[in-house]
Amino acid sequence: MLQLLAILVAASLIAVGVLLYRTGRLSGQTYKPPEGHDTISVEDVVTAYQVLEAELIDAVDYYIESYTAWADRESPIDARFLVKSCILYDVDIRMVLAQARVESNLGVSGMAVKTNNIWNVGVYDGKTHREIHDGYRFKTPALALLAYLDLLKRRYLVTRSELEVMTDFVDVDGRRYATAQNYELQLMSIYIDMCKHTNLGVLWLETRGLYQHMRMVLEHPEKHVGKSR
């Protein structure tokens, strides 16, 4: 299953490149954004997305390095892969980072150091260290991220937004992600702190929004693309 996920995401990451390339091929034409925004060239849309994504990757990398500066090891989270995966799965990167902090201090504490299971997917109270090590170990942190994002989309973010889930972290069957009674409070405290003291929120919303609009350009070019004057 995880190998299949890895293949799917690898293909999706390639698809991002193809999306940028195909959008860029619409040279000499203009992109018509939502009402209230100026019409700009398709080339500028591609450039804007690449710049925004790069800024978001840098901001995430800085956030991870700053938070784990106290640790005796570097966080195993790759900022570039994290950003691209969150964009493709359409999951708020602030939620992902908040859970990574609560579950394993961004991968530098607890069993995650040995299992790569940064978000503790499948790890429940009562399981022994041996059970966790043997049954919930991932070959790489990237595979752990994919399993986590897949779980969120299948079981938690089905009919609710990220904020709604973080205030009541139960799945479609009403089962909690964690047994800690203050789990949601911890997540929201970190989330709010990120919104107040970093530019992650602004960069995330702009990057995700522009990516989604680029997809619409390709799916319905007759609505969004016209000849330049």
Model feature map: region roles:
Residues 2-229:
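Catalytic cores of secreted/periplasmic lytic hydrolases that degrade extracellular macromolecules
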